[in-house]
Amino acid sequence: MAQIGRGEMTDDTHGGGLDWLLDELLCRLSRADRAIVLSADGLLIGRSSNMSRDEADQLSAVASGFQSLSRSTGRYFGGGAVRQTVVEMENSFLVVTSAGSTAYLALIAAADADMGMVAYEMNLLIRQVGTYLSSRPRGDVQMTGAGRGS
């Protein structure tokens, strides 16, 4: 697992004050490795400092795709709104959770991670900064308010 350090953030980070919160989340979850926040359409909003921009963009695209498939499945089969998508792989989990009205928190955790604690900590972070995590889709051309561009 990668070592997490606050001094590793690069200049192209767009998460502002969000990135350090993702780092803190990973510090609380010893078996979690990477975390991002993304918009519903896959735009990267913030990333943990142990991720390169390219790696975070890739995870953002994957997480957005899984959430889209999950939402479609929920609608088609009457399952309702998607609260969380979990992908179990041989060596890790991908967990994607709704974070605000149009944003998601995605996290990679080791296969032996305590998934109850992962879900708890992710939801705790979302409750603490929920309105900050909300994001407008890129395609919304009627966006109003100064300084809210992507």
Predicted region positions:
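Acidic, low-complexity cytosolic segments
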Residues: 2-34, 41-150
